[in-house]
Amino acid sequence: MLSRLLKCKIHRAVVTHAELHYEGSCAIDGVLMDLAGIREYEEIHVWNVTNGKRFTTYAIRGEDNSGIISVNGGAAHQADVGDLVIIATFGDFTEAEANAHKPRLVYANPDNTVNHTANCIPVQVA
């Protein structure tokens, strides 16, 4: 049996473009994609922290070090420039793989540069 686990995420990136008439997708700064381990054309989940909307699309590579996070096509109705988003991917793992798995977590600054990276989320305390 396979378990679906968080593979990677970019946490609190800022939407820089919302392009309704661009071919659907989400363009992500190539440096952020590489650090997170997101592949071009990979399915991504986008969770809009600002308005609570969630949607699924695919990633395309944006210019390296540009800071671009562009929500394109119909998904542009789900995000506005300046919104905070979390971009995540998931993977299916065998039990042995799941036991050893650590997600790749990239935390963004407000200009979409990298604040820090991690491979675990701290325990939430009451």
Curated annotation (Swiss-Prot):
InterPro entries: Asp_de-COase-like_dom_sf, Asp_decarbox. Belongs to the PanD family. Substrate binds at residues 57, 73-75. GO terms for biological process: alanine biosynthetic process; pantothenate biosynthetic process. Is synthesized initially as an inactive proenzyme, which is activated by self-cleavage at a specific serine bond to produce a beta-subunit with a hydroxyl group at its C-terminus and an alpha-subunit with a pyruvoyl group at its N-terminus. It holds the Pfam family Asp_decarbox. Coiled coil: none annotated. Its main location: cytoplasm. This is Aspartate 1-decarboxylase. Transmembrane segments: none annotated. GO terms for molecular function: aspartate 1-decarboxylase activity. Heterooctamer of four alpha and four beta subunits. Gene3D superfamilies: 2.40.40.20. SUPFAM superfamilies: ADC-like. Its EC number is 4.1.1.11. The lineage of its organism: Bacteria, Pseudomonadati, Pseudomonadota, Gammaproteobacteria, Moraxellales.
